[in-house]
Curated annotation (Swiss-Prot):
One cellular component (GO) term of this entry: cytosol
PROSITE patterns xrefs: OMPDECASE (PS00156)
Matches recorded under InterPro entries: Aldolase_TIM, OMPdecase, OMPdecase_AS, OMPdecase_bac, OMPdeCOase_dom, RibuloseP-bd_barrel
Primary enzyme class: lyase
EC nos: 4.1.1.23
Gene field: pyrF
Origin species: Streptococcus pneumoniae (strain ATCC 700669 / Spain 23F-1)
Keyword presence, Lyase: yes
Pfam families hit by this protein: OMPdecase
Subunit structure: Homodimer.
Record keywords: Decarboxylase, Lyase, Pyrimidine biosynthesis
GO biological process: 'de novo' pyrimidine nucleobase biosynthetic process; 'de novo' UMP biosynthetic process
Protein name from the UniProt record: Orotidine 5'-phosphate decarboxylase
Amino acid sequence: MREHRPVIALDFPSFEAVKEFLALFPAEESLYLKVGMELYYAAGPEIVSYLKGLGHSVFLDLKLHDIPNTVKSAMKVLSQLGVDMTNVHAAGGVEMMKAAREGLGSQAKLIAVTQLTSTSEAQMQEFQNIQTSLQESVIHYAKKTAEAGLDGVVCSAQEVQVIKQATNPDFICLTPGIRPAGAAVGDQKRVMTPADAYQIGSDYIVVGRPITQAEDPVAAYHTIKDEWTQDWN
């Protein structure tokens, strides 16, 4: 099922910066928030408990990639935090992804990273030594993710349709690199607007700097949310 709230990437260096940002929003507004490596390493597990205590949904974006037993044990810990979604690298393999699923349980969604949206085809071929097209690599990882019993993948919006065709229509496609029309692209190589992401079939969209660094973050959030949901029935 599609998530009507854009997922806000909390790319902040400290707990206090997050508190200041969230204080801009009405207390009763439930947000979907992404906690990445920088914030999690700075604030620790307490940041997840804090956000959940405020009534928000949390996507813990740590991209685990290790041997199966280590990932399984880590996921058991994350399940106790009450995260709504977390992820692993599909490149870790089917056995690792199955172990992650077992450790996390079924209460939270578990998705896998295919290729980072900062990765170009030339970079993939040169540094990862994968001699296929970028799209073929993404489809391969998506199929293996589905085989492992995960809920979906992180992918570029341009890849959503082929992934759903290769897996199934309910396979979650979470797409970062979302920018409203006219916004700076930054370090993302493959970007798309919220409206285009909806039309192409994305289930979740992740938006960071266009919201967190906006002059009015609350207004920016609602503008993006309106663009994302404008054609919903």
